[in-house]
Amino acid sequence: MILPCPAAGGAGETLDGGDKWVQVVRRQHDPEVVVFANLLSAAECDALMLAAKPRLSRSLTVDTHTGDEALHPDRTSQGMFFERSENELIYRIEARIAKVLRWPVKHGEGLQVLRYRKGAQYAPHYDYFDARDAGTPLLLARGGQRVATLIIYLKEPEAGGATVFPDLDLQIAPKRGQAVFFSYPQALPSSLSLHGGDPVTGGEKWIATKWLRQHEFI
């Protein structure tokens, strides 16, 4: 399967983002996990949060039985979605993501912004759609399987809130403007893509998430 993948380069390398160069902080393979240093500027982080704030509501998860969205106790953040290319800021960020990850903008879901207040968390989970779930065919019809995730840190909390990968014994501390990318070539636990957000224990954490699909997302 062809997957989104940044160009070759390890820690310290810079990648062409179209309108700026993006630095690689950390990279590992099998599974592919890449941390970028400066994907967004501080001004872009602020602008995203400002635009998202009035549209926030309790975050939903995909109901795997129906394919619809529903509240779930494992996810306690607030969130919203931007439409693809909704405004100039979103267009610019999505174009940069597409350039760095070498994956078409149209193969991505709308950018989701999430706010985690003190105590909020997201229990470890997989982003792909499980073939055993009744709602999966409806989800796949919109653009095929999810094959990769990009998490961008818009605001770092005072404490807590790390992105964790339990199967990799890996923790990534939120840092404003940084992002973590990971792919999952198979929709199976063997992809080692189990991940979650630790509870925020001080301040607030804001992130933006981009899920990438096999085909054009509709």
PLM feature segments, named:
Residues 1-218:
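Fe(II)/2-oxoglutarate oxygenase catalytic core
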